Amino acid sequence: MNELRPKLFDVMKGYTKEQLIKDILSGIIVAIIALPLSIALAIASGVGPVQGLYTAIVAGFFISFFGGSRVQIGGPTAAFVVIIYGIVTTYGTDGLIVATIMAGIILCIMGLCHFGSLIKYIPYTITTGFTYGIAVTLFVGQIKDFLGLDMGAVPSEFIEKLGAYAANITTINPVTVAIGAVALVILILWPKVTDKLPGSLIAIIVTTAIVYFAKLPVNTIGSVYGELSSEFPSFHMPAFSYKLVQELISPAFTIAILAGIESLLSAVVSDGMIGDTHKSNAELIGQGLGNIFSGLFGGIPATGAIARTAANVRNGGRTPIAGITHCITLSIILVVLMPLASLIPMTTLAAVLLVVAWNMADWTSFFHLCKTAPKSDMIVLVATFFLTVFFDLVVAIEVGVVLAALLFMKRMAETADVTAWKYADEPDVTPGEAEKMRDIPHSIRVFEISGPLFFAAADEILTITSDKSTKVIVIRMRSVPAIDASAMRSLRDLAARAKKKHITLIFSHVNEQPMSVMKKDHFIELIGEEHFLPNIVEALDYAENMVADSGHKAAK
């Protein structure tokens, strides 16, 4: 149960006043970083700006309080933008809330079932493919607001989106582009000046002031979304229906997988920064509770945010108190300063997300991976990338996982091999080789199996053949780590053929897992326990004695 115990309860022992001050200061700084990102990501996801803050406040609190990392900062992230936009377009806000709650439940179940370590089995090529796909989709999604295009709602499909931009390209607002360019310049250059204050906050303050005081014709959050609510999020139970749950189970599962991958990756990165070890299963439960309550209080899916978590560590945060302080600070901003957020130019938020999208993708690494990775990995990478861009994230991950599994099984099947031993007197055996070989009679055939024997490789067993002189077949299995039911069926077929030909089967060096499967299948009873020997020397001695005994009986 200690694995499920929240990290907060562990780190409070010996907690000092000095660390409390550091955590509070770090939490305030991280809240300032999270503010523009939460608003921008919510808008990019197709929901209202305040829902981004609701998510950072509610989900962030539960992730910090119940999670398995000391310094994790939870909230909305760019990874969810694509899937959230698709859900909102198809099912509306209530559908998104249902999917978020379902994803939270799935994450809690994963944590309770100790699935934290299983996330590592998601191939790197899949996570890379959909991450770069998300980056492209997020980047393209900001073109309307960055250029100030006068058009209706942006289509959710990638090709339709590009078509809509092309059709409305003549409506570009030069003033909007200029303000967006100013924001971009600040975002790019500010980190070189100082990392104490986030460039996104400076860009928002500067461009908002320019637009407001110069009364420039630029769309702002207020002009697009109206007056923003400064009320604290209220509890809302969405209407569940069997049909809706059935339709949303796949998107919810995708959200859960994404949240699990990103949060545990963030936890691993922060572990390296502070020299700690997170609890993966407790972290999944914290993420699950965060998403459940985020949905119930009007938020969107959330996970551990790597950039915000790293900022927390760099500013002295070392316990979940920093994450909780970040939530409290955002709550105060929501109540006191939210009306001012309506003045923020939409092009500035688009610029913030353009930089986020650019930072998500290191294209040099992407093309290097395409050039150097094995062909099967490249297929998975490219397929996941293009499916994310041209279809959606749900399809991309489903196809990516299935494709990766099939290609992995193909690789494993190709490693499985059955090799027949040569006899010392065969013409192609050199004298030097013959000296090292054991001289066995031609009535004994030896086959060595290598690699895992599973359904894709079970046919290799069919290559075990005999001739009229064969009395005994010795099967050496020291290089077989595992077998499955399909392989057992093939072994039973081999045993049946051998019995018809009055050939005895002897097995040498059967490893633990194959032996366990054979016992469970009663295969050992079928063959005879005495025909299973611990090594090849004893197996050959046993086979030669059998042949010799049968020869003596025939002579009599």
Residue ranges and their predicted role:
Residues 359-526, 544-552:
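The feature marks cytosolic C-terminal regulatory regions of anion transporters and related permeases
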Residues 1-425, 490:
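Transmembrane helical cores of multi-pass ion-transport proteins
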Residues 289, 330, 516, 535-536:
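Short secondary-structure boundary/hinge segments and terminal tails
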Residues 554-556:
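Intrinsically disordered, low-complexity cytosolic terminal tails
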